[in-house]
Curated annotation (Swiss-Prot):
It comes from the Bacteria. Belongs to the SepF family. This is Cell division protein SepF. GO terms for cellular component: cytoplasm. It is found in: Cytoplasm. It comes from Enterococcus faecalis (strain ATCC 700802 / V583).
Length: 214
């Protein structure tokens, strides 16, 4: 008989049979519990909370309505603009001066012309009496008309056909000078320039005089 059997060891250590039964039952209980207990789920690693990213909100920029910014011209541009403005003013002044001088010259010319007309009117009007003998003397009569002199033509000493030719020539001359020709007697014609008027009675009374001042 072995000395290491279960009963001998239990008696040696003072363990009763009830205690043996307790251990046997406990082992059976643990075995049944292990069989009946559902398998434990493997412990999942605790998910780490992701670091919350800082959300960036794009806040709309507040734009304040304001007047448009006007760029100031550079110094060179301002200088060019100032020169241009000065040239414009100088040109306007020059043009005004030229216009003023022209007006003054026109006024002076007008005054001179009026003075000349007054002087011409103040001059003694002369009537020249001519008794032509040939047609060629018609040119001499025309020269007196161009000199703004009245001419009293007496055709008593010229033939009739040449007298008609002279009258035709003098008619064209006074027409060109805006003058006048009129018959003041049987064989006497009065030719006057544009700035002179003589009545026929005066011309007939002075027909025998070569020059008459009035």
């Amino acid at each position: 008989m072995s000395i290491f059997n279960k009963d001998a060891l239990s008696s040696f250590f003072g363990l009763s049979g009830e205690e043996d039964d307790y251990y046997d039952n406990y082992e059976e209980y643990e075995e049944r519990k292990a069989v009946n207990e559902p398998p434990r789920r493997a412990a999942r690693p605790k998910p780490q909370r992701p670091v919350q990213q800082q959300e960036s909100y794009s806040q709309p920029a507040y734009t304040q309505q304001s007047e448009p910014v006007v760029e100031k011209p550079s110094a060179r541009y301002r200088s060019a603009e100032a020169h241009q403005e000065r040239d414009t003013q100088q040109a306007a002044y020059t043009e005004k001066k030229v216009v003023s001088m022209r007006s003054s010259n026109q006024s002076a010319t007008t005054n001179t012309r009026r003075a000349q007309e007054s002087t011409a009117n103040a001059k003694t009007h002369k009537i020249t009496i001519i008794e032509p003998r040939v047609y060629s003397e018609a040119m001499s009569i025309a020269k007196h008309l161009f000199a703004e002199e009245a001419v009293l033509v007496n055709f008593t000493l010229v033939e009739e056909d040449q007298a008609r030719r002279i009258v035709d020539f003098l008619t064209g001359t006074v027409y060109a000078l805006d003058g006048d020709i009129q018959r003041v007697g049987n064989e006497i014609f009065l030719c006057t320039p544009a700035n002179m008027e003589i009545d026929s009675a005066t011309a007939q009374s002075l027909a025998n005089k070569q020059f008459f001042d009035f």
